[in-house]
Amino acid sequence: MIVKKLHENIGVSIEGIDLSNLDSDTFQKIKKLWLEYLVIVFPNQNISDEVHIEFGKRFGELEVHPSLSHRSSKNPEIYRVSNVDENGDIIPNKETSWQYLKQSWLWHTDSSFRKIPSNGSILHGISTTNKGGNTLFANMYKAYEDLEESMKQKI
């Protein structure tokens, strides 16, 4: 397992492993890295939805997103963030589901609207664009630590 730090405040990249065939010790190392660095990138993993789901379940119970329009018809735990439907057809930008998807372009935290927010998200980029499509991450622990004490007291 090769671990490379991505930024001083957040993120590591892990190479040299196969997510579809993880032993318990390797998974525990991954979980520890996730808790410490908050974001993990696993480059060049060609995984199925089933492997994606099984990997996620190792972290805990999976959430089923309330939006039916982007939920996988075969695997409800998979929420499709795409302008392409499950049949490979481009979703017209006038469709309600496309408009809903467009809202995710704004800064947000996944599932923060829920009574009990999720612990994290697993994003599997199957086909990504060279322009746009950015996904950003922030270390809110670090943001809080960097606040002046008077602001922390207000919060």
Labelled PLM ranges:
Residues 1-155:
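Non-heme Fe(II) oxygenase catalytic core, chiefly the N-lobe of the double-stranded beta-helix
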